[in-house]
Swiss-Prot record:
Species: Pseudomonas fluorescens (strain ATCC BAA-477 / NRRL B-23932 / Pf-5)
Pfam families for this protein: DUF444
Protein name: UPF0229 protein PFL_5654
Biased amino acid composition, Gly residues: 92-108
Region Disordered: start-end pairs: 85-108
HAMAP family tied to this protein: UPF0229
Protein family per UniProt: Belongs to the UPF0229 family.
Source domain of life: Bacteria
Length: 424
C-alpha cells in the first residue's frame, strides 16, 4: 500500500477553515487568555501571538450514553478497603491537569491541558473584538458612491492591458495537446516504424516512401494547429467594490506638564499606543492629529508625541484651543467624523478649568462624534474632572470620562470607552 505524506506547514492554507471553526468554538477561553495577556504584557509588545491553554475536560466531544434512571439489578464484588460514601483519593503525579509539581506516581490516568498558539493577527482580532468608533457616519455624500477596484478572478474577455500571460499560455498549451495529441502519437509510431524499416528492410522502398508521406502529412496537420487562438486569451477581471466614503480624524491630546510623573506619562503613552494600534488596524483611512501641551500646546508628529521629553506648567485650555483651530482649518464637521482622546493627571491651573469647559461646550462638542477623557491619578479628583462632569451631563452620548490608576487599568478602560454600542 502506498502512502502520501504531506509535510507542508499548512500548505495552501488548507486547514484554515478547520482552524477558524476551532477558534469560534473556544472563543470564550481564547478571549479570556487574550485579556490576561494584555494585562500582563507591555502595550508595545504586540509583535507576536499568544499561547492558549484549554483544560482537557473542555475539549471532550459530546457523547450519547445511558441515563442513570430506571431499575437495575447488579452484583458487585465486595472489598475490605472502602465503604459506601467514602471518597477515593486523587492519584499522585500523573493525573490529568497536573501542573508538573508533586511526586511521580505509578498509577493514575488523565489528560493534560490542550495548548496551541494563535497568530498576531488572531491575537489583535480578539483584543479589539466588539470595539469601534462610536457614531461613525457618512460625510460629504452628494449622491455618488466611491468605489475601489479589486481582483475578481479570470475572464475570457477584457482589456489587452490586463491579459494574464501565464493563464493564456497554459490554456493554449492545453488546447494544442487536445487537438494534436492523436496526431503526435501516430507521428511517433510512424517514425519508429520508418526507423525499423530502414534498419531491417532497406530495400523496401514502397513502404518507406509511404511512411515518409504519412510522416509529412501528420507533421503538416500538427503545424496547422495555431500556437495561440482567441479562445486561449485570459484576462484579469477587475470589479468595482463600493467603498464607504466616511472620513474620520482622531485628535490625541496628552498632558506633558511637570505635574505628570514619569509613571503617569508612561501610562498615558501606553493608552495612546493602544488607541493608535486600534485605529490603524480597524480603519483603512483615518487621520491622527497629535497634540502635546503644558503651558502651551503644539501639534507634533508621532515620534515626538511618544518620545519627546519637553515639559512645563499646566494650561489645558491651550490644547483645546489648538484643536479647535485645526478643526476649523482642516477638518470641517460637515465632511469629517471628528474624534478626540485626552489624557491628563487632572492637575490644572484653577482659573483655566472653567475655560476648558466653555471651549468644549461651545466650540468643540457640537462638532465632534465622540470625546473621551482619561484622568491618570490615584488621588482625589480636582477641578478639571468636575468641570468635565458637567460636560458629560450635557453631552451624555458623545462625551465619556474614565479614571486610570495603574497600567493594569488601561485595557479595561479602553474597552469601556470604545465598546460597540447598539444602534437604536
Amino acid at each position: 500500500m502506498s502512502y502520501v505524506i504531506d509535510r507542508r506547514l499548512n500548505g495552501k492554507n488548507k486547514s484554515t477553515v478547520n482552524r477558524q471553526r476551532f477558534l469560534r468554538r473556544y472563543r470564550d477561553h481564547i478571549k479570556k487568555a487574550v485579556e490576561e495577556a494584555v494585562s500582563r504584557r507591555s502595550i508595545t509588545d504586540m509583535e507576536h501571538g499568544e499561547q492558549i491553554s484549554i483544560p482537557g475536560r473542555d475539549i471532550d466531544e459530546p457523547v450519547l450514553h445511558h441515563g442513570r434512571g430506571g431499575k437495575q439489578t447488579v452484583v458487585h464484588p465486595g472489598n475490605k478497603e472502602f465503604t459506601a460514601g467514602e471518597h477515593i483519593a486523587r492519584p499522585q503525579g500523573g493525573g490529568g491537569g497536573g501542573g508538573g509539581r508533586g511526586k511521580a506516581g505509578n498509577s493514575g490516568e488523565g489528560m493534560d491541558e490542550f495548548v496551541f498558539q494563535i497568530t498576531q493577527e488572531e491575537f489583535l482580532e480578539f483584543m479589539f473584538e466588539d470595539l469601534e468608533l462610536p457614531n461613525l457616519v457618512k460625510r460629504n455624500l452628494t449622491g455618488t458612491d466611491t468605489f475601489k477596484t479589486v481582483r475578481a478572478g479570470i475572464s475570457n474577455e477584457g482589456n489587452p492591458a490586463r491579459i494574464n500571460i501565464i493563464r493564456t499560455l497554459r490554456s493554449a498549451h492545453a488546447r494544442r495537446i487536445a487537438l494534436s495529441g492523436s496526431s503526435r502519437a501516430k507521428l511517433r509510431e510512424a517514425k519508429e516504424e520508418l526507423a525499423r524499416l530502414k534498419r531491417e528492410e532497406p530495400d523496401n522502398f514502397g513502404d518507406i516512401q509511404e511512411l515518409e508521406a504519412e510522416i509529412e502529412r501528420l507533421s503538416a496537420r500538427i503545424h496547422r494547429v495555431p500556437f495561440l487562438d482567441t479562445f486561449d486569451l485570459k484576462y484579469n477581471l477587475l470589479v468595482k467594490q463600493p467603498n464607504p466614503s466616511s472620513k474620520a480624524v482622531m485628535f490625541c491630546l496628552m498632558d506633558v506638564s511637570g505635574s505628570m510623573t514619569q509613571a503617569t506619562k508612561d501610562i498615558a503613552k501606553r493608552f495612546f499606543i493602544l488607541l493608535y494600534l486600534f485605529l490603524k488596524r480597524n480603519y483603512d483611512k483615518i487621520d491622527v492629529v497629535f497634540i502635546r501641551h503644558h503651558t502651551s500646546a503644539r501639534e507634533v508628529d508621532e515620534e515626538e508625541f511618544f518620545y519627546s521629553r519637553e515639559t512645563g506648567g499646566t494650561i489645558v485650555s491651550s490644547a483645546l484651543k489648538l484643536m479647535q483651530e485645526i478643526m476649523a482649518e482642516r477638518y470641517p464637521s460637515n465632511e469629517w467624523n471628528i474624534y478626540a482622546a485626552q489624557a491628563s493627571d487632572g492637575d490644572n491651573w484653577n482659573d483655566d478649568s472653567p475655560i476648558c469647559r466653555d471651549i468644549l461646550i461651545n466650540q468643540i462638542m457640537p462638532f465632534v462624534q465622540y470625546y473621551t477623557y482619561v484622568e491618570i491619578t490615584p488621588r482625589e479628583h480636582q477641578a478639571l474632572w468636575f468641570e468635565y462632569e458637567r460636560i458629560a451631563e450635557a453631552f451624555s452620548d458623545t462625551f465619556a470620562q474614565q479614571q486610570l490608576v495603574s497600567a493594569g487599568d488601561i485595557y479595561p478602560v479602553f474597552r469601556e470607552l470604545f465598546q460597540r454600542r447598539l444602534v437604536t
